[in-house]
Amino acid sequence: MKPGGPYGDVYVLRLGHRPERDKRVTTHVALVARAFGANGFVLEGVCDEGVVESVRRVVARWGGPFTVECGVSGRRYVRMWREGGGEVVHLTMYGVNVDDVAPVIAASPRRKLVVVGAEKVERFYYEEADWNVSVGTQPHSEVAALALFLDRLFRGEWRFIDYSGGFLRVMESQRGKRVERKG
């Protein structure tokens, strides 16, 4: 499988990043997006170079393609995405259960923008989303929500993505750590 799978493009938009507080979690959102099949990561608002560089280093070592953008207006990005024919999936604990809607979302061939909040998400995103998807109805991590949603969207096929361009690859091992250098 190539990143984006049958949809061509799947991007993750991270809202409300607070540089002094969210570096690690936001970096993990981006890394989960990459590992679970998205084509890219978009950081709304402030451009946190620490997060951007961290993700780019992972892509250089482990392969891509995976794009990173930052400093965009989340509202404008969502509107642009919809105007371009894509659909918007907002992950929230107040939406429809992921297991009930993931097959319907996966059946649509349209490009996907997955919106993940950090702090209180504005009403705009609930209203503009084609889908408000709940991964559980209890407070938990946006990293977990994204991983579960992308797993359902790609039906587990993200495990077979071929990451070209990197020079490291983990080899399966019952015990210990095995990392192979490519090329």
Swiss-Prot record:
One of its GO terms (cellular component) is cytoplasm. SUPFAM superfamilies: alpha/beta knot (SSF75217). GO terms for biological process: tRNA nucleoside ribose methylation. It is an enzyme of class 2 (transferase). It catalyses: cytidine(56) in tRNA + S-adenosyl-L-methionine = 2'-O-methylcytidine(56) in tRNA + S-adenosyl-L-homocysteine + H(+). Keywords: Cytoplasm, Methyltransferase, S-adenosyl-L-methionine, Transferase, tRNA processing. S-adenosyl-L-methionine binds at residues 91, 117-121. HAMAP family: tRNA_methyltr_aTrm56. It comes from Aeropyrum pernix (strain ATCC 700893 / DSM 11879 / JCM 9820 / NBRC 100138 / K1). Its EC number is 2.1.1.206. This is tRNA (cytidine(56)-2'-O)-methyltransferase. The keyword Nucleotide-binding does not apply. Belongs to the aTrm56 family. Homodimer. It holds the Pfam family Trm56. GO terms for molecular function: tRNA (cytidine(56)-2'-O)-methyltransferase activity. Specifically catalyzes the AdoMet-dependent 2'-O-ribose methylation of cytidine at position 56 in tRNAs. Its main location: cytoplasm. It is found in: Cytoplasm. PANTHER family: TRNA (CYTIDINE(56)-2'-O)-METHYLTRANSFERASE.
